[in-house]
Regions:
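C-terminal motif of bacterial Sec signal peptides marking the signal peptidase cleavage site
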Residues: 6-8
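Bacterial signal peptide processing site
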Residues: 10-12
């Protein structure tokens, strides 16, 4: 009723004024949506202690007072933001050693250049041994300018540098494009069998594990590459070590760029965590470290064969390694304490390869030698759940070593290669002296079942780890070198041989690849670059 009264009593309205002229508004671009908030940081992996497997494992942590063992000890998912291959098998997962992709489908291998090394004493001489993988880096400009040893190469924006440790006891520096030396070789005093590692932050900091005590105390030597000065020495002869008679470092360590820590295993049986306390000034051309050291020491029931020859694998706060007695362990790096162990049954020198699956499961691939079990026996190829240590499958292969005239071990020395892309369903193993004392095998297994998909029989045994290469269309290939000096390019889906090239000398080392050029050393005092075309 109230609404009706208001309508009746309202004064009649005047006619409305004419509408104002339209206002022309220039079109405005559609506002950009606000970027999503940054993803929360990756959390550490919390694993309960497996009391069943660790029941009789004696372990202790021997640490300098200043070593921080805290939640910050998480490896980033990306090892380096710079271009290159910085450590054995590329990073913490130890999954591959290639940076970049090929262009077109490859069908040819050719030698681009070769460099001759010096020689040490017999029987090591020169060239490269096992594992002997180089690092390859395209230096950030500010870092390149901070290294006077590069000379005129400091101004070369296109420089990609190969850094190769050698059995001659030196580290060699080579221009990937030309094969010419970029700076003087760096003498370490003892033969280098393993693979050097470079600071993934791009800092000119090089870690060199020595393999043979020829001229001076053996251990891990750390060099700054500004003036080629040794800034730290970790002696392999460690009074805390369970194995006192051998102090080699064939293992290639990992540097956590978020925490300034370096983790490495020694053949003396200790696992080391070094808080580096790095102080680098690229303008003043100075780099110093003042490491504080934590040592993880353990004793596993029935295993007196100490020594870590493989390169530690890691994912976030978890690290994985095996020893000369076949004890595999998962270590929480925040506390340097074990979470589980697995007894493989024999010496395990091959580095453990990790894989993060599409459904966020962490898997571990490993294989044993035929060593402590006798000259003839079985090598075991395995897939484990990396969070529990439980095997998901295992496959055995018969191999033949020898006891006389000298002891020769058989089995697997090469790191397993989990396939990616079009071969993401496959994992590749290289077998040495299997089935006979001179033979080798490359075998592709189904990741889910362990079933054999293909195999390639080799006329010679092999210790070298293959590299997976991918072309622009996503097709996958394997590059592999063996005893006898033959480098093979295989179609990864079938094992079909596409190309070969013959090098001088036996190949014990593993290659690194940058783009379509691989670098690989031999025992004939040579370092080669091989083009994959």
């Amino acid at each position: 009723m109230l609404g009706l009264l208001l309508s009746v009593c309202r004064t009649p309205e005047r006619p409305p004024p004419p509408p104002p002229p339209p206002v022309v508004v220039a079109p405005q671009p559609t506002p950009e949506p606000e970027p999503p908030p940054p993803a929360p940081p990756k959390l550490s992996i919390e694993l309960p202690t497996d009391s069943r497997t660790l029941r009789m494992l004696d372990r202790e942590l021997l640490a300098d007072a200043g070593v921080p063992l805290a939640d910050a000890q998480l490896f980033p998912d990306t090892y380096s933001v710079h271009e290159g291959v910085f450590t054995f098998r590329g990073g913490p997962l130890r999954a591959n050693a290639a940076f970049g992709t090929l262009g077109a489908k490859p069908s040819k291998l050719s030698i681009a250049w070769s460099v001759t090394t010096g020689q040490s004493k017999a029987p090591w001489f020169g060239g490269t041994g096992w594992t002997g993988q180089p690092v390859i880096v395209k230096w950030p400009a500010v870092i390149r300018h901070s290294m006077p040893k590069l000379g005129a190469k400091r101004q070369d924006d296109a420089l990609i540098e190969v850094i190769q440790g050698s059995l001659d006891g030196a580290v060699h520096f080579i221009d990937l494009a030309t094969g010419k030396r970029t700076r003087p070789a760096l003498s370490t005093g003892n033969p280098i069998k393993g693979s050097v590692s470079l600071d993934p932050r791009g800092y000119p900091l090089l870690f060199v594990g020595q393999g043979i005590p020829e001229n001076k105390p053996i251990g891990l030597r750390v060099f700054e590459l500004i003036n080629h000065t040794e800034v730290f020495f970790l002696p392999g002869s460690d009074k805390s070590a369970p194995r006192r008679g051998w102090g080699a470092f064939d293992s290639s360590g990992l540097l956590n760029r978020n925490t300034d820590t370096y983790v490495v295993g020694g053949e003396n049986g200790l696992l080391y965590l070094l808080k580096l306390n790095t102080n680098f000034d690229p303008l003043e051309l100075t780099l110093h470290v003042a490491p504080e050291v934590a040592r993880y020491r353990y004793q596993s029931p029935g295993n007196q064969n100490y020594g870590i020859e493989n390169s530690l694998s890691a994912f976030r706060n978890l690290a994985f390694f095996a020893d000369n007695g076949g004890t595999l362990q998962a270590i929480d790096l925040r506390t340097m304490s074990p979470r589980w162990k697995f007894e493989a049954g024999d010496d395990t020198d091959a580095t453990l390869a990790l894989e993060l699956t599409r459904d966020e499961q962490l898997k571990l691939y490993t294989a044993t030698e035929v060593d402590k079990t006798g000259p003839r026996g079985e090598t075991w190829l395995r897939k484990l759940d990396a969070l529990t240590g439980k095997p998901e499958w295992e496959v055995s292969e018969v191999c033949q070593g020898a006891l006389a005239p000298k002891k020769i071990d058989a089995g697997v020395f090469a790191t397993p290669l989990p396939g990616t892309g079009e071969v993401s369903h496959l994992v590749f193993f290289v077998l040495s002296r299997c089935p006979g004392p001179e033979n080798g095998v490359i075998v592709a297994l189904d990741k889910d079942t362990g079933g054999e998909i293909w195999r390639v029989d080799l006329p010679h045994f092999s210790w070298s780890t293959p590299v997976q290469l991918n072309d622009a269309d996503g097709h996958a290939y394997l590059l592999h070198g063996g005893i006898g000096g033959v480098v093979r390019l295989l179609e990864a889906t079938t094992g079909r041989q596409l190309a070969t090239v013959q090098l001088e000398g036996d190949i014990e080392s593993s290659p690194s690849v940058f783009g379509s050029r691989a670098v690989l050393g031999t025992r004939a005092n040579r370092i080669y670059a091989i083009d994959v075309k």
